[in-house]
Amino acid sequence: MSGTGKFIALCKELESAVKARYGGTSHGESAYVFLSKKAEFKPYTKELDLIREVRNLIQHKDVEVKGKEAIYVDEVLMDALREIIGLVQHPETVGDICTRDLVTAGLSTPVKEVMDRMLDSSFSHIPVLDGQGKLLGIFSENTIFTRVAKEGMEALTEQDCISDYEAYLDIRDHVRDSFEFIAETVASEEAVERFKKRDGQGRRLAMLVVTKHGDPSEKVLGVLTPYDVLE
């Protein structure tokens, strides 16, 4: 097969992969334009545009001069095309990009210790886990504000442990932020779309808690925040 023939074959493989994964494109949009609009493929915008232009030139023009191909497609572009095909066929998953080295707390952890960890790590939300590594709730600065609002400043002591805040840890009860579970095998682009939305109460999604199947009763494997996936 000629060089241009190999290139066209790869283009068709990519187009088939896009159709298989996404069910095709809308409004007759080319696979290359379609992919360039997706966050996952933003780093490949230049390559996708070039591939599209070269493909159209070869497909719709006579590229032979005196019976020989007048266009040479370099392996650099071929390799980029193969890489994009690989990403479409084997998409990056939540498990690939989530943070697994977590800063966590247990019910017996002193609050002062947790706050020091938050300052040192710049994490604003700390997962509180039980002895099996399952999520009990999320501790944040708003957890403290909520307790003060409910119980008064006199309720706070230097000896406080996370258990003293147990009534305010439930992920459903945070006022400003929401939290969801997600399976580690879910495509990362779905996580991106989730972070762009607000829930029915207008709360932003602050964290995705990653488990094997997205089940709250499973061990926490990692977390994902908007800063991990959004530019």
Predicted features by range, described:
Residues 1-53, 60-97, 106-123, 128-131, ...:
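Amphipathic alpha-helical interface elements
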Residues 37-39, 174-178:
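Short, local alpha-helical segments
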Residues 164-169, 178-182:
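A conserved mid-domain beta-alpha-beta active-site/ligand-binding segment of alpha/beta enzyme cores
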Residues 95-99, 173-176:
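Short, low-complexity disordered segments enriched in Ser/Pro/Gly and basic
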Residues 138, 181, 218:
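Active-site-adjacent beta-strand anchor residues
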Residues 210-219, 223:
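Terminal recognition/anchoring or ligand-binding modules at protein termini
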Residues 104-122, 129-130, 148, 180-213, ...:
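The conserved cystathionine-beta-synthase
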Residues 45, 176, 204-205:
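A structure-centric signal for secondary-structure junctions around beta-strands
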